[in-house]
Amino acid sequence: MNINVADLLNGNYILLLFVVLSLGLCLGKLRLGPVQLGNSIGVLVVSLLLGQQHFSINTEALSLGFMLFIFCVGVEAGPNFFSIFFRDGKNYFMLALVMVGSAMLLALGLGKLFGWGIGLTAGMLAGSMTSTPVLVGAGDTLRNTASLGGQLGVEQDHLSLGYALTYLVGLVSLIFGARYLPKLQHQDLPTSAQQIARERGLDVDSQRKVYLPVIRAYRVGPELVDWAAGKNLRELGIYRQTGCYIERIRRNGILANPDGDAVLQIGDEIALVGYPDAHSRLNSNFRDGKEVFDRNLLDMRIVTEEIVVKNHNAVGKRLSQLKLTDHGCFLNRIVRSQIEMPLDDNVVLNKGDVLQVSGDARRVKSIAERIGFISIHSQVTDLLAFCAFFVIGVMVGLITIQFSNFTFGIGNAAGLLFAGIMLGFLRANHPTFGYIPQGALNMVKEFGLMVFMAGVGLSAGSTINSSLGEVGIQMLASGLIVSLVPVVICFLFGAYVLKMNRALLFGAMMGARTCAPAMEIISDTARSNIPALGYAGTYAIANVLLTLAGSLIVVIWPELPG
């Protein structure tokens, strides 16, 4: 039996889509030196190559893909988005605005200078900023721009072409910029990180390997009683001195949970909970020949839970003010906007932060009720909320606003982004509403993006050869300019206008570019994860601004001369 692969793929959109995705994801795993191509560019390259062979796909798949992606971007940004405006995020918002605004203005100027259409210009902006939200926002607005008429298909093809040509330029140039730009300024990042650590009482080396706490039991002897000198547990402050706390005491055969007024006596058997290294550092008064193995004494359920910060008595407070250890709980990590924060007592908590806390199940539940709620451990998505807010986003996107003779449609991108932000925000404030496991959210977002990339690549592939020779060199040079010049402008603005600490500034700049690989380089250069504070500050707002920039550049293009 002979199988014509070309006919098979042309006759089956679903098969063609997943062939493109499979080949593109394989290509995306390749590395060029320290730079990995990535899934989006891999799928785009494969789809462009197959598009040259006149393979095509149903455009509805393209629309559904971008809608899922942009909605999930909003859901991720929602928990921390509003805190950018209402707390101390003014500097971060301004940095993100300067980064995105300067890049958009440069792209508009270069597009007019070289006589490109809006498709190439918007695609170049998206690729140079390595930002799929720009691409998605521009693509959606193009489809809703009636004035393009017969040029719509050409501009959509040029959009993906501009993105494909400049994506690697944007990624590689930003990575090199992150590596070498800190060396060109007067303050080195390690010194800046240490400075902000001293000012805020942070630990510059607050990255550590996390272990779960363990429970071990010891018999109290004369040495330990002498060391305690008659003080009760509250006065002794055993946790401050040892890193462990006393969870249980067996005295005269009776097992009890001690309060702060308990005084140690000879013959007591005490259960200590702490990290393994804390047990190893215990004074010899505790452990030399005195460890006991008692099933009942050691029978305690240590759990690890993710607690979402929600309550007003925790939001805006320093971590030390929660007094987790006084309640017998251990903090393993802090996550904000999917970014791990410095693990330090002086980190200020935002609504939506996730604290990973270990300890006795009762104690962890008690502390969770004080500061927020325990994140649901279910793997079941609240599909009702997901679908309902998706519908709301589409309906909002249908709204049009008219100024004189100019009509502006909000569009699906902005509408779905708004609906996603609201769903994410409500989820951060109501533990049983709108739950979406992070793995499920990542999968839907990534799949939607890959479907969108496959669609635009197959659509644009047939015209790539004729367009590449006309704009290739100009496009690459413009991509380099749009990638690096806004970074320099943002640095000057942050350093000399906002007078920000350099470690926080460089982290915030990488957040404004939503580029995790460049952020890793900044952290390595600073020998600290303190720049993550700046990255988390700009990341959520930058995703929103980049989507709006993609739509805005298409809207204002016809109004510009030239």
Swiss-Prot record:
InterPro entries noted in UniProt: AAE_transporter, RCK_C, RCK_C_sf, Transp_YbjL_put, YidE_YbjL
GO function term, MF aspect, one: monoatomic cation transmembrane transporter activity
Regions that span the bilayer: 8-28, 32-52, 66-86, 93-113, 116-136, 158-178, 383-403, 406-426, 447-467, 478-498, 537-557
GO biological process, one term: potassium ion transport
Location, primary (coarse class): membrane
Any single GO CC term annotated in Swiss-Prot or TrEMBL for this entry: plasma membrane
Highest taxon in the source lineage: Bacteria
Membrane association type: Multi-pass membrane protein
Key words, A-Z: Cell membrane, Membrane, Repeat, Transmembrane, Transmembrane helix, Transport
HAMAP family recorded: YbjL (MF_01015)
Sequence similarity: Belongs to the AAE transporter (TC 2.A.81) family. YbjL subfamily.
Identification of the protein by name: Putative transport protein ECA2683
Organism (species): Pectobacterium atrosepticum (strain SCRI 1043 / ATCC BAA-672) (Erwinia carotovora subsp. atroseptica)
